[in-house]
Amino acid sequence: MNPLKYLFAAIFICCLAACQPKTKSTVPVVGFVDAFEDETISQARLGFVAALKDSGFSEDKKNIKIEYRNAQGDIPTLTQIVNYFISEPVDLLATCTTLSSVTAVQKTKTIPIFEMVSPTPARMNVLDASGKAPANLFGAVDDLEYIDTSFSIIPKVLKPKNGKLVVGMIYNQSEPQSADAMQRIKGLADKLNITLIALPLNTSADAQLVTQSLLDKNIDAFFANPDNTVFASFETIKKNCDQKNVPIFTSESGLVKRGAVLAFGADIYQWGYQAGEQAAQYLKSHKTDGLKPEMVKIRKRVYNPEMVKKYKISLPPNFEPVK
């Protein structure tokens, strides 16, 4: 045969192969979407995978495939990731933090979404006109009531430098949960006779500048609220607060391990585990009957021994050292 004919034949075969439809995986595929890289938030994925494994689904057994993508804080990349998983399509989406969950809800109405480290559907503003959550949204969520307990601890364990306690915080104006938390804390601060100074921070790149500006206002304490930007910028925040001897309080137990004084809040690993239990139930039955977004179940009162000693804090009852 003429060599050119061999070449044309090879090209023809390749074209035929390229035109064939994608072969659906014989095992269920989970598309796990993380909005950004963070040491604390990453515990949710570990918990989610552990729950699947405890229910019999693991990549070691080759009876499930977990595709992981991280947007590294970039919204266009996050959208591309979700669109890619939908086009595959994956059997279910696991979304970690608010941005991932909202993006997934906006992009698909059919693929089941199991959210974690995210607020209630109402706080994400994804309810329909009749007040119902998306029919394909499940997983574990949280509201903001626990923040009251966390913030109210501050005046019980810390004395003001001057006459009135001054607490500083930063928040992300573009993140509904963060903005809602700031408003809630502001109302609570008024009731507790605390002066709250809140500054917007919409990108971790500005963390140094905004934190220093806050510290220049002579605050007594810093409150780290549930905010993706706070998580991503925490080491910068802590470094600046340490230099000014300003203790950090929080509602997020994972941040205590990273240097906050104490917290009453959800265990991030268990939050992911709870969402994973729902996902496993769906994978077993291929039905969503009885599933819905449910409140996170496990919260912890934890403290950082090193920070408690540094700031001479007298602990409230029922707090345990962070592990």
State the predicted function of each range.
Residues 2-8, 19-323:
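Short hydrophobic alpha-helices and adjacent helix-cap/hinge residues
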